[in-house]
Amino acid sequence: MRLILATSNRGKVKEIKALCKDFKVIPYSELIEEFEIIEDASTFKGNALIKARAVFKVLSQKDEYKDMVVLADDSGISVDVLGGAPGIYSARYASKGASDKENLYKLIEDVKKSGAKGSPAHYTAAIAIVTKNYEYSVHGWMYGDVIAEVRGDGGFGYDPMFIPLGYDKTLGELDDDTKKNISHRAKALSLAKIILQTL
């Protein structure tokens, strides 16, 4: 089965490909020109569905993609000491179009401004699957703590400041195999794969 990803984020593409080896995973940007998708829902699930529906709508106008399956992910980090921020704004926390590094340093600065050296936090991943006849969504979570510093250079996004529950290293310091077993996206994808195998 061809699984078309409604993302061109290299980090997400790499992680999803590694976790979905049973499928031919193709970022939509390899099939058509990238276009802006306005993510204006108030939840991760809502934004994942917006992305999947938008890519499905454009691609379904071409005969060769009529029976495709589109998968979209919306994910982010919620920090307790910041009242759950950045939440659904994780990808644009520093500003619209901000880089991973800019978002990371903005979050570190905001945690420091709160007077804390760290805080309980969690990642959420919502995955939406859109086909010709159905829409599905699943979630995965990873709990832990953020620290107000960068440790490690692996992963992407906020990984260098997030220490998963039960570990003493950040996601930026952990190896890929360990992360595959504990990440919010891996948990959501394991549920998504159950759905995909029935299609």
Swiss-Prot record:
Substrates-to-products reaction catalysed: XTP + H2O = XMP + diphosphate + H(+); dITP + H2O = dIMP + diphosphate + H(+); ITP + H2O = IMP + diphosphate + H(+)
Lineage top rank: taxon: Bacteria
Residues in coiled coil: none
Active site, per annotation: 74 (proton acceptor)
GO MF term set: dITP diphosphatase activity; ITP diphosphatase activity; metal ion binding; nucleotide binding; ribonucleoside triphosphate phosphatase activity; XTP diphosphatase activity
Residues the entry annotates as binding substrate: 7-12, 75, 156-159, 179, 184-185
InterPro entries the record matches: dITP/XTP_pyrophosphatase, ITPase-like_fam, RdgB/HAM1
Swiss-Prot/TrEMBL keywords: Hydrolase, Magnesium, Metal-binding, Nucleotide metabolism, Nucleotide-binding
Binding site for Mg(2+): 74
Enzyme class, UniProt record, top EC level: hydrolase
Cofactor(s) needed: Mg(2+)
Signal peptide annotation: none
Cystine crosslinks: none
Claim: Hydrolase is one of the keywords in the record: yes
The protein's assembly and partners: Homodimer.
Listed HAMAP family: Non_canon_purine_NTPase
Family, per entry: Belongs to the HAM1 NTPase family.
UniProt protein name: dITP/XTP pyrophosphatase
Native organism: Sulfurimonas denitrificans (strain ATCC 33889 / DSM 1251) (Thiomicrospira denitrificans (strain ATCC 33889 / DSM 1251))
